[in-house]
């Protein structure tokens, strides 16, 4: 996790409680199996990290983790809360999409993560 943390810090993440929560969430799900309709594959170092550095996206198993829909949203929320500059802007675009899709502010969705999890499962079936 230290390597991931250092790379995230190098593109403008702040070492705050949300970065720690993000890294903990990733570590806690390291062995989560892919489950049809119930999980999302998440890039630990986000795709925008590589785009900001003009590098090819790392799709290796070491940079991927399976997360429930609610944990996936939380992961991006935590990244947003520790990001700065272009990295923060790129993360905020994902939230605008989710807010538009469910017609709720992201804060309301975060408060009701269990409902979000079920909405995602239902939408994929």
Please identify what each model-predicted range represents.
Residues 84-104:
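N-terminal accessory alpha/beta regions
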Residues 64-89:
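Short Cys/His-centered divalent metal-binding micro-motifs
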